């Protein structure tokens, strides 16, 4: 696999996130082949036809309504399939129904002979990334979740608006669960090497209460958007496109994705969001940022919360019987 061109993507799930992701791939000229799988075959046929009409403005690409068997020679399978988060519902409320969907999808993808990389975006993403690893039997590095990539983008954008700097020049991360127990790594947030906490103090941008409020607006952004329009999909779609490009082009880009935890942060046997080098083999190398004591406690708490849910779910025979890892 290391020597072949990584240009074929199979998307499973043609809902709001999936179709937005497909549109992002077309707009950005990412991948040479895109197959779309969904229970609603006509929807995938319609989207494939509609998307193909944009190719004359972007770059050549084969786009089609696919079946699970088409994943056999794919380089990347992207999972957006799952029940959507409803108003007032947390990502963790989705666990069991989306575990069932994930088990079914992953089993069918693996049965096709697929040997590439799994990229998981369905929620709760850290738990479903773990489940994809368990159900697939794949090496840990070849199962990647979108993790805190969207949260980090939201964080950088919120900071950029406050300090009047291009968001791409803000170096800051959200880590932990993609959800309510996530946290901001303020100890390493900086612009051009200047810590943002110091910048705030010197330039009178934000006081302590405003800093807390800014983070909370980032953490709770999905709830706000869901209450207004029913779902979030544009931001995560572009985040997935960015991760896709890093994998297909073997970029070795540092991105905040959902990574298997081996005890580096006092957390084991689960996936959590942290920066990692991402390339053709998936997670090439996790980057373990040295956290301060408060941040370490938050990472441990986030992991403990997810691990408890994982253990409870996988104690059930319907999931335990499908485990390959």
Curated annotation (Swiss-Prot):
Amino-acid positions noted as binding substrate in the UniProt annotation, renumbered to this chain: 85, 91, 123-126, 151-154, 232
Descriptive protein name: L-lactate dehydrogenase 1
Binding site for NAD(+): 17, 38, 43, 68, 82-83, 121-123, 146
PROSITE patterns the record matches: L_LDH
PANTHER family: L-2-HYDROXYCARBOXYLATE DEHYDROGENASE (NAD(P)(+)), L-LACTATE DEHYDROGENASE
Pfam families the UniProt entry points to: Ldh_1_C, Ldh_1_N
Active site (UniProt): 178 (proton acceptor)
Predominant location category: cytoplasm
Catalytic activity as recorded in UniProt: (S)-lactate + NAD(+) = pyruvate + NADH + H(+)
One of the record's GO molecular function terms: L-lactate dehydrogenase activity
Description of how activity is regulated: Allosterically activated by fructose 1,6-bisphosphate (FBP).
InterPro entries listed in its UniProt record: L-lactate/malate_DH, L-lactate_DH, L-lactate_DH_AS, Lactate/malate_DH_C, Lactate/malate_DH_N, Lactate_DH/Glyco_Ohase_4_C, NAD(P)-bd_dom_sf
EC number, as in UniProt: 1.1.1.27
Binding site for beta-D-fructose 1,6-bisphosphate: 156, 171
Presence of the UniProt keyword ATP-binding in the record: no
Complex formation: Homotetramer.
Record key words, sorted: Allosteric enzyme, Cytoplasm, NAD, Oxidoreductase, Phosphoprotein
Modified residues (Phosphotyrosine): 223
Function: Catalyzes the conversion of lactate to pyruvate.
Family: Belongs to the LDH/MDH superfamily. LDH family.
Subcellular location: Cytoplasm
Gene Ontology process terms (BP): glycolytic process; lactate metabolic process
Any single Gene Ontology cellular-component annotation: cytoplasm
Pathway as given in its UniProt record: Fermentation; pyruvate fermentation to lactate; (S)-lactate from pyruvate: step 1/1
